[in-house]
Swiss-Prot record:
Keyword Transport: yes
Database matches in PROSITE patterns: ATPASE_A
Domain of life: Eukaryota
A GO molecular-function descriptor: proton-transporting ATP synthase activity, rotational mechanism
Keywords from the named record: ATP synthesis, CF(0), Hydrogen ion transport, Ion transport, Membrane, Mitochondrion, Mitochondrion inner membrane, Transmembrane, Transmembrane helix, Transport
Residues passing through the membrane, by range: 9-29, 64-84, 88-108, 121-141, 150-170, 182-202
Gene field: ATP6
Any one of the GO CC terms: proton-transporting ATP synthase complex
The protein, known as: ATP synthase subunit a
Length: 214
């Protein structure tokens, strides 16, 4: 039972809210048809979505990440389930892991080129320390921006849906009930669109960070 608007963001509301996404995830992983075809599907998506017929590990990783986020976003839209993409800790862990791997890989492969990104070419010598500081801060807050963007957008959608459901359930005898339901269905479809857009933005930002890799 949802006691307030923020109950949908609490993963401890019930065991069912955790079991449903976990069961569906395990089913997708162990399903024989999916297991046989997933490699070809990932290769096709990586080639078609990134405008290149060649298959490489980076594009495959980005495609898998986008599919994973979309899958969990859509699971969170199901009634009485907990969407892990609304969890600050889950998203922060994911963002820190990916950002850290990109950063660490760059410094291991070519420390000089990685450090060169901190100092814009042609910058005045007097402004160089200040520019290096700004660039360092912008790099350090990247996991935070990835996390906040995804959590805020998905959580706001769940809260608004809970608010609309609460209003509808308290006005069942209202003459404008059909209009209210129509508005809620329209917003629900909009939230499905947001699920895809947020996954795309998260992956797009990761690809931009990877482009800075030496």
């Amino acid at each position: 039972m949802m006691v307030d608007l923020f109950s949908s963001l609490d993963g401890m509301t019930s065991l069912w809210s955790w079991l449903t996404p976990m069961f569906l995830s395990v089913f997708m992983i162990w399903n024989k048809t999916w297991s046989m075809d997933q490699n070809n599907i990932i290769k096709y998506l990586a080639a078609s979505n990134w405008n290149n017929s060649t298959y490489n590990l980076t594009k495959s990783l980005l495609t898998i990440m986008m599919v994973l986020i979309i899958f969990n976003n859509l699971l969170g839209m199901a009634p009485f389930t907990y969407g892990i993409t609304t969890s600050l800790w889950v998203n922060m862990t994911l963002a820190l892991l990916l950002w850290g791997l990109i950063l660490l890989s760059g410094y291991i492969k070519s420390p000089k080129k990685s450090l060169a990104h901190l100092a814009p070419s042609g910058a005045p010598l007097l402004l160089l320390p200040f520019l290096i500081l700004i660039e360092s801060i912008s790099i350090m807050i990247r996991p935070l921006t990835l996390t906040v963007r995804l959590v805020a957008n998905m959580s706001a959608g769940h809260i608004i849906l809970a608010l609309m459901a609460s209003v509808l359930s308290s006005n069942l005898s209202n003459t404008s009930l059909s209009l209210s339901y129509l508005i809620m269905v329209g917003y629900y479809l909009f939230e499905f669109f947001v699920c895809f857009i947020q996954a795309y933005i998260f992956t797009l930002l990761l690809s931009l960070y990877m482009n800075e890799h030496p």
